Structure formats: C-alpha cells, structure tokens
Amino acid sequence: MAAAQAVEEMRTRVVLGEFGVRNVHTTDFPGNYSGYDDAWDQDRFEKNFRVDVVHMDENSLEFDMVGIDAAIANAFRRILLAEVPTMAVEKVLVYNNTSIVQDEILAHRLGLIPIHADPRLFEYRNQGDEGGTEIDTLQFRLQVRCTRNPHAAKDSSDPNELYVNHRVYTRHMTWVPLGNQADLFPEGAIRPVHDDILIAQLRPGQEIDLLMHCVKGIGKDHAKFSPVATASYRLLPDITLLEPVEGEAAEELSRCFSPGVIEVQEIQGKKVARVANPRLDTFSREVFRNEKLKKVVRLARVRDHFIFSVESTGVLPPDVLVSEAIKVLMGKCQRFLDELDAVQMD
C-alpha cells in the first residue's frame, strides 16, 4: 500500500522539501510504471481535461486548466505573450518636434501605447509597403503646441496654471480614418486604450506635430504587439497535515502560511488547525523554519492542475485573447499534421 502511494505521488505531485523539490519531471509515459496504462487515449483525455473560469473582469482572467501536460500549458502561455496579434504604432512621421524628447525616443514611446482596435478586422501589411491602406493601417495625428496662459496669476509657480498644453497625453492623439474606415468603425472605437498616458512635457513655444501609422503584428516581432500585460500560470498547491495540530501550535502553523490557507477551529474546547484553502498559498515554505511544525506538514503541487492568470493591456478582453490563443495553437497543430502528411506522401 505504501509503495502504491509513493508511486502515485511521483506520478501526480511535485513535492516541495526544505532543501529541494522532488518529482519535477513528468514520468507518466507508457511502460514507465508497472500496472499503469499510460498510453495515449483520446477518450480518457477528454474525460479528464477541463477548464474552469474562477474570476473574470474587464481586463483580467483567472482560470484553471486541468488534465494537461506542462509543455502544452507553457506553449499556451507563450502564445498569449508572443503570437496573438494586435495593432501598434510602427511608423512615425515627424513634421515638427521641438520638445526635449528626441525623435527616436518619442517614436519608441508612441509604439508602446496600447491601441484599442480589433486586430481581427485588419490584415498584415505586406513587406516593403510604406503607404498602407484601410485594410492594414490605422492612422493617428498628434499636434500639440504649448503656450503661456494669459490668465495665470503673476505670483503663480504651478505649471498647470502657467502654461496651456504643457503636458502631452494620449488623449491628444486623433484618429484619422483611411478610406472607408469612418463608415466601418463607430466614433470612439479606434483610440488609445488609456487617455492619460503621459507622452512628453512642453514649455511655451515648443511643439509636437507628427503622424502615426499603426499596423498588425505579434509580440514575437516586438514587445509592443504583445496583447497581455502578464500571462502566467502556477500549479495548484496541495497541503497535507500528517498529524493533528492543536493548541498554540495551530495558531503558529496558521501564521506560517498565507492568510486563509490554514484555518483554526474550536473543537471540544481545543484549537485545531485544518487546511481551508490551499489555493491561496504562495509556498514561501516558512513552515520549514519551525523545527516542530516542519515534520507535520507535506507541501506539494498538483502536476496537471494549472492556475492561469491573464491580464490584458486593454486592447481586447481577456477571454477573447484566450480564445485567439487557442486558435493559434490549433493552427500550429494543423500545420504540423500537414507537414507529416507531406513527408509520408514523399
């Protein structure tokens, strides 16, 4: 019985010890364990695999992906970071820039501004095409000139009172429709995601006048095209108490974990510790610093239970980003199958 439990732990858990981590490699491949059928089975995979949405709001999504290998989960994460397309500033035509910010620095800063535009409605621009059309390009104009405020108090030292337009924000960017874009997109549909991003600061007489071309691209080419502020996953914590923990030890154990992980209950006049919500734990392993408590707790992670956190830059809702990432992954799989078929035909 103990041997069977040890094998099951090796197959399904990553165990965190005081000085190291065990069972970090996937070992459930065919023939590795006697008595286990680890051959690929589509029906078994469909039965065990599931996706549970835990939390979703306008810009963030947390969901569980259960029953899949780390290689596939990591591929999905990397696709979110680098292969889901967005629209971003690619070309900046500077007509006049007398600000303290150099042209090339200003252009780079503009490129990192998230643009609220659905990339699925646009095509990739052809290589070498400098002009752009309504199907592959968005155009923005930025024209701001700083002047003195004639109504400012004489003894004022506040720039906000002394000057007009001394701060250039993304709200000063104006969309210039190309072709029939004005008919296709309603007012306010094409804009910077945030209107309060500071671009530059000016003083009286200084001016910025430029034209921006936004194109479709992916984060693998440049980070400005990445649709997520972060996309990460962690394995589900699995915390087991090997023996009852009571009294002051229960309170001490609770303090060793993140709030809400260990709950102290009153049972027949005694304080008793129980694992309430292991999902909340960050695995600081603080419990291993306590000589008494480190022997009564086993810390592990469930090998095939991934907690994904996706935070959108605001270009697209996070659930749409996840759907697009799945489509990209399916396309990669299909191309691989097509290549295999082509090799077999040869």
Swiss-Prot record:
GO biological process: DNA-templated transcription
Keyword match Nucleus: yes
Coiled-coil intervals: none
Top-level taxon in the UniProt lineage: Eukaryota
N-acetylalanine found at: 2
Single Gene Ontology MF annotation: DNA binding
UniProt-annotated location(s): Nucleus; Cytoplasm, Cytosol
InterPro entries: DNA-dir_RNA_pol_30-40kDasu_CS, DNA-dir_RNA_pol_insert, DNA-dir_RNA_pol_RpoA/D/Rpb3, RBP11-like, RNAP_Rpo3/Rpb3/RPAC1, RNAPI/III_AC40, RNApol_insert_sf, Rpo3/RPB3_RNA_Pol_subunit
SUPFAM superfamilies in alphabetical order: Insert subdomain of RNA polymerase alpha subunit (SSF56553), RBP11-like subunits of RNA polymerase (SSF55257)
UniProt entry keywords in alphabetical sequence: Acetylation, Cytoplasm, DNA-directed RNA polymerase, Nucleus, Transcription
Cellular component aspect of the GO annotation: cytosol; fibrillar center; nucleoplasm; RNA polymerase I complex; RNA polymerase III complex
Family (UniProt): Belongs to the archaeal Rpo3/eukaryotic RPB3 RNA polymerase subunit family.
Function: DNA-dependent RNA polymerase catalyzes the transcription of DNA into RNA using the four ribonucleoside triphosphates as substrates. Common component of RNA polymerases I and III which synthesize ribosomal RNA precursors and short non-coding RNAs including 5S rRNA, snRNAs, tRNAs and miRNAs, respectively. POLR1C/RPAC1 is part of the polymerase core and may function as a clamp element that moves to open and close the cleft.
Subunit structure: Component of the RNA polymerase I and RNA polymerase III complexes consisting of at least 13 and 17 subunits, respectively. Pol I complex consists of a ten-subunit catalytic core composed of POLR1A/RPA1, POLR1B/RPA2, POLR1C/RPAC1, POLR1D/RPAC2, POLR1H/RPA12, POLR2E/RPABC1, POLR2F/RPABC2, POLR2H/RPABC3, POLR2K/RPABC4 and POLR2L/RPABC5; a mobile stalk subunit POLR1F/RPA43 protruding from the core and additional subunits homologous to general transcription factors POLR1E/RPA49 and POLR1G/RPA34.
Protein name: DNA-directed RNA polymerases I and III subunit RPAC1
Species: Bos taurus
Lineage: Eukaryota, Metazoa, Chordata, Craniata, Vertebrata
Gene: POLR1C
